[in-house]
Amino acid sequence: MKDFGSERVTEPPGTIPSMAWKLDNSREIGDKEMRVGLRAIKLEWDNFNQICSSCHYTESKIKARIEEITAKRGKLQNPYTQSSGVLYGVVDEVGTLWEGEDFKEGDSVISLTSTAGLPVH
């Protein structure tokens, strides 16, 4: 817990994930990580509104903009509002340090952590 995901930070070095410009969002996980298959993301209102208005409320453009943000930053954090959202998903893989805990692959999860600090692929 002491690193708090800092090994995923690529820009700028030495920052925590939620403050970083870019995260490593590769699919391989470390011993203390888990990979969650996204089922839904609830964007914060400012984030959602800014993306929608900049895309003229066109669904295909909104989807493309979200994909562009995650490809560029490795996480879903709007570069204009600095806001993000929370996610719902299913555990796909668990790192070895989590073995024996109260969750397993296939469990549903809702993050209490903003997607600003989570790698999104």
Task: Report the location of each language-model feature.
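Short glycine/threonine/proline-enriched tight-turn/helix- or strand-capping micro-motif at secondary-structure
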Residues: P13-N25
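Glycine-rich beta-strand-centered segment in the early N-terminal region that forms part
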Residues: R27-K42, S54-T115
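Short, Lys/Arg- and Gly-enriched loop/turn segments at beta-strand edges
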Residues: N47-F48, T115-H121
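A eukaryote-biased signal for short, well-structured alpha-helical docking elements
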Residues: M1-V9
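A conserved mid-domain beta-alpha-beta active-site/ligand-binding segment of alpha/beta enzyme cores
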Residues: T10, G74, P119
